[in-house]
Amino acid sequence: MKLLGIFLVASFAFVLSFGEEMIEGENPLEDQRAELTSCFPVGHECDGDASNCNCCGDDVYCGCGWGRWNCKCKVADQSYAYGICKDKVNCPNRHLWPAKVCKKPCRRNCGG
């Protein structure tokens, strides 16, 4: 029983110390927003692990080759452009490119 009490006290102390670190530490989302004061044009190298907000344009994303190498800002084709646009609506640097309304692609009876 004594061992259980020691375990519970140690666990509680660990949880509290972890919570204080999260409160005192910086918010990674705020850091990302501070970094995004510019964006890359189509064809520029980009970081495949970073946000698509790094590439300028509502339908521009960071696309990579096999194994996350040779990453460049690319224009999404019509089938993916809507999803990319919806993802980029909340980009903190969206004011850097001419924003447009995200439009769903025409699936059938497109009047053509």
From Swiss-Prot:
Residues 20-33 form a propeptide. The keyword Repressor does not apply. Contains 7 disulfide bonds. Keywords: Amidation, Disulfide bond, Ion channel impairing toxin, Knottin, Neurotoxin, Secreted, Signal, Toxin, Voltage-gated sodium channel impairing toxin. The modification Glycine amide is found at G111. Disulfide bonds join C39-C56, C46-C62, C53-C85, C55-C73, C64-C71, C91-C106, C102-C110. Residues 1-19 form the signal peptide. GO terms for molecular function: sodium channel regulator activity; toxin activity. Belongs to the neurotoxin 04 (omega-agtx) family. 02 (Tx1) subfamily. The presence of a 'disulfide through disulfide knot' structurally defines this protein as a knottin. This is Mu-ctenitoxin-Pn1a.
